[in-house]
């Protein structure tokens, strides 16, 4: 019997309510009685004496049977004056709480209510709070990862921006203005390249000319005409190259529309609506221009259908070039349009200049390879009758000439000059380059803003976690108290046998 007295009673928490009902400790219809008790408690707490402990019991916690017992004990002190000679209280407060306790003790309703609270806390409330805290921690890790990604992405885009600016030869402080300034400096850069070619290509051209004349037996045939011309006269005008005479007047094309467009586009009204405003501006200008043309020249369309002077395109320079190409009828000695450009500015002559440079480079590189190999009998006998300029060449001289040519080709084909040539040909290219570079900078700024947003969200998740953790600790504490009260109450019903509520994981 004594051994049986110490055998513990293990009850699975999830089945605690069924266990109490099956063993007739509680009524099957306990929920309706609990609703009646809750209504009476809500009515009773409206009229309570001033007491700090009572205020703590009534603030923010679910009032159950044991709270009611403590409230009744406190009321015995505050309502002592209402006690009659029979030991009963005439105070309505005491009567209300005594009735509540009596209803609780009927069919052990208090025990099943406490068990219901325990099951709800264990199965729902505590897991829900833990899940919310875990979600906050997960969000903090995710926001921290995104913060690092945004920081790295912003730095990468900013680095790409400055790297691209370096390729264009600008600092990036004022992209449009710096590009236009480079275009203004383009003639001086090309003049330097022309001067370098004029000083360094003489011997290389003579070697190539002598080799062609000796091998092909046609000494009168002139090779590399463009290089010869630049070597003699430098980066002169297309007019001088075409006619052989220096022009008396040079009327260079004026790109006046370019600064005006820059000044107009420099007005930034924000990140939205820019395209619509610019399109409306273009349409207004075109319509106005059309109205002016029709008013001044009412018969232009009928008299000259082929010479349409109205340019409906987006590129003002295209109109100017079209007119200048008809400048072959300019007075003698006057260079206009493409004729007024230098050889390295005009696309056709610049391409010819590059082609001849590459032709000369390939020849000299091959000749350097031939001179580096051991001379055979055929080679020696072949060049015995060659001109002195060919016999006096060495591998070192060939390599030096090749390096000079490579330097000239590298300067003309550099990315910076290629962009400047495109800007010179089309002012709209400035807009595209500016937009391309500014887009990288905007992406960097957006990523930086996103990083700040991730920091803010991470802080919000941290604050939410800090607010949930005390709630969880308090709920765990209350649930442990409920567990102890239930175990003690059931133990009394079984002669003090130990009771263990299993599956709480508190």
UniProtKB/Swiss-Prot annotation:
Compartments where found: Endoplasmic reticulum membrane; Cytoplasm; Nucleus; Cytoplasm, Cytoskeleton, Microtubule organizing center, Centrosome
Region (Required for interaction with UFL1 and mediates interaction with CHEK1): 269-506
Glycyl lysine isopeptide (Lys-Gly) (interchain with G-Cter in SUMO2) cross-link site: 450
GO molecular function: cyclin binding; MDM2/MDM4 family protein binding; mitogen-activated protein kinase binding; NF-kappaB binding; protein kinase binding; ubiquitin-like ligase-substrate adaptor activity; ubiquitin-like protein ligase binding
Keyword Nucleus attributed: yes
GO BP field: apoptotic nuclear changes; brain development; cell population proliferation; definitive erythrocyte differentiation; endoplasmic reticulum unfolded protein response; liver development; mitotic G2 DNA damage checkpoint signaling; mitotic G2/M transition checkpoint
A Pfam match: CDK5RAP3
Secretion signal span: none
Primary residence: endoplasmic reticulum
Result after altering residue 312 to A: Abolished interaction with ATG8 family proteins
Highest taxon above the source species: Eukaryota
Entry comment, domain topic: The shuffled ATG8-binding motifs mediate interaction with both ATG8 family protein and UFM1.
Protein name: CDK5 regulatory subunit-associated protein 3
Species this chain originates from: Homo sapiens (Human)
Gene expressing this chain: CDK5RAP3
């Amino acid at each position: 019997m004594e051994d049986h007295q110490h055998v513990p009673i293990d009850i699975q928490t999830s089945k605690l309510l069924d266990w109490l009902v099956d063993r007739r400790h509680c009524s099957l219809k306990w929920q309706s009685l609990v609703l009646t008790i809750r209504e009476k408690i809500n009515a009773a707490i409206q009229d309570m004496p001033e007491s700090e402990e009572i205020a703590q019991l009534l603030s923010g916690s679910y009032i159950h049977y044991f709270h009611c017992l403590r409230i009744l004990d406190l009321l015995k002190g505050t309502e002592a004056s209402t006690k009659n000679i029979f030991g009963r209280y005439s105070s309505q407060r005491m009567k209300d709480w005594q009735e509540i306790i009596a209803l609780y003790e009927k069919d052990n309703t208090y025990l099943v209510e406490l068990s219901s609270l325990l099951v709800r806390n264990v199965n729902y409330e505590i897991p829900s709070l833990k899940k919310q805290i875990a979600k906050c921690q997960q969000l903090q890790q995710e926001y921290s990862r995104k913060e690092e990604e945004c920081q790295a992405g912003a730095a990468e885009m900013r680095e790409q921006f400055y790297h691209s600016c370096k390729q264009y030869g600008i600092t990036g402080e004022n992209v449009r203005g710096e590009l236009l300034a480079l275009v203004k400096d383009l003639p001086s850069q090309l003049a330097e390249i022309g001067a370098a070619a004029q000083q360094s290509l003489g011997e290389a051209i003579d070697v190539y000319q002598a080799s062609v004349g000796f091998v092909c037996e046609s000494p009168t045939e002139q090779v590399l005409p463009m290089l010869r011309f630049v070597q003699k006269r430098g980066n002169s005008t297309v007019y001088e190259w075409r006619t052989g005479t220096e022009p008396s007047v040079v009327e260079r094309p004026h790109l006046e529309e370019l600064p005006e467009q820059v000044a107009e586009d420099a007005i930034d009204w924000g990140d939205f609506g820019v395209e619509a405003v610019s399109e409306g501006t273009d349409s207004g200008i075109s319509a106005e221009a059309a109205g002016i043309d029709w008013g001044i020249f009412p018969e232009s369309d009928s008299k000259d259908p082929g010479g349409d002077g109205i340019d409906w395109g987006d590129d003002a320079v295209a109109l100017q070039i079209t007119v200048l190409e008809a400048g072959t009828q300019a007075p003698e000695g006057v260079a206009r349009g493409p004729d007024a450009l230098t050889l390295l500015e005009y696309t056709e002559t610049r391409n010819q200049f590059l082609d001849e440079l590459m032709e000369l480079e390939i020849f000299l590189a091959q000749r350097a390879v031939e001179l580096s190999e051991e001379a055979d009998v055929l080679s020696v006998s072949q060049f015995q009758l060659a001109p002195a300029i060919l016999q006096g060449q060495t591998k070192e001289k060939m390599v030096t000439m090749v390096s000079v040519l490579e330097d000239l080709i590298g300067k003309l084909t550099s990315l910076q000059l290629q962009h400047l040539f495109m800007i010179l040909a089309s002012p709209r290219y400035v807009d595209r380059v500016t937009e391309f570079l500014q887009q990288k900078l905007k992406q960097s700024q957006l990523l930086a803003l996103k990083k700040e947003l991730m920091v803010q969200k991470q802080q919000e998740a941290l604050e939410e976690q800090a607010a949930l953790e005390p709630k969880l600790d308090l709920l765990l504490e209350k649930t442990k108290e409920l567990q102890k009260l239930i175990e003690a109450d059931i133990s009394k019903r079984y002669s003090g046998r130990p009771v263990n509520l299993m599956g709480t994981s508190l």
